[in-house]
Amino acid sequence: MIKRGDVYWVDLNKAFPEGLHYQRNIRPCVIISNEKNNKFCDTLTVVPLTTKRDHLSIHKRIFINNTENFVLPEQIMTVDRKYVLSKLYHLNFILCTFSRKNKS
């Protein structure tokens, strides 16, 4: 069963028509949809990963099988599970970043 925090290979070429501004190719994606959705729905919410470093503060670095990856939260998407291929890894946590500015 697919679980939140799993990293799967997803075929984004088939999931989205060409010409749209989405990540392309078959790439690893973190499953972020909740367990009820993952069990009963035909779609999954995912966030794609890339190995390309671009130094944006919102792109959080994670290591999967000793390979540096970056989470692309601005690319969160819902995909049909038929485009979700094989499991690559499981993260023991979901990445959340909160920032709070002190008001002086």
Question: How would you name each of these model-derived features?
Answer:
Residues 1-104:
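Conserved functional hotspots at enzyme active or ligand-binding sites that engage polyanionic ligands
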